[in-house]
Amino acid sequence: MITGIQITKAANDDLLNSFWLLDSEKGEARCIVAKPGFAEDEVVAVSKLGEIEYREIPMEVKPEVRVEGGQHLNVNVLRRETLEDAVKHPEKYPQLTIRVSGYAVRFNSLTPEQQRDVIARTFTESL
C-alpha cells in the first residue's frame, strides 16, 4: 500500500518537512519534494531515512491509464482462397481492400512479399 507522509521529526535535519510516498510492500520511499541529499522522484529504501516520525498526508489517487506493449488487431473478413486467388488473378479483384497496420489498402497494391505476409499471418488454424 502507498502512503503519503510529511516527515515531522528525523535524525537527519535535511528530512524535516519533506514529503514522501511510502510503499510498505516494497519497503521503499519516493521523494516527492526534493531536499538536500535527495533528488526529486528518487526512490530509496525506507531504512535510508533513518529514525523518523511523520504524519500521513491524505492522497487522492486517480487511475492512470498505461499502455505498455499493447496489441493491435486488424480484422479482415475474407477466405484464404480469395486472397490466394487475388495473388494469381489480380485483374479479378481490383477493389479488394484489406486492413494493414490500421490502414485500408488495396490488396493488389502490395508487393508480392507483402501479400504473402498478409496471407501467412492473417489466417490461423485456431485461436
Swiss-Prot record:
InterPro entries per the UniProt record, alphabetical: Auton_GlycylRad_Cofactor, Form_AcTrfase_GR_CS, Gly_radical, Glycyl_radical_cofactor_GrcA
Key word Glycoprotein present: no
Modified residues (Glycine radical): 102
Domain Glycine radical: 5-127
Cellular compartments per GO CC: cytosol
Keywords: Organic radical
Domain of life of the organism encoding this protein: Bacteria
Keyword Membrane: no
One example GO MF annotation: formate C-acetyltransferase activity
Function: Acts as a radical domain for damaged PFL and possibly other radical proteins.
NCBIfam families found in the cross-reference section: spare_glycyl (TIGR04365)
Record-given protein name: Autonomous glycyl radical cofactor
Phylogenetic classification of the source organism: Bacteria, Pseudomonadati, Pseudomonadota, Gammaproteobacteria, Enterobacterales
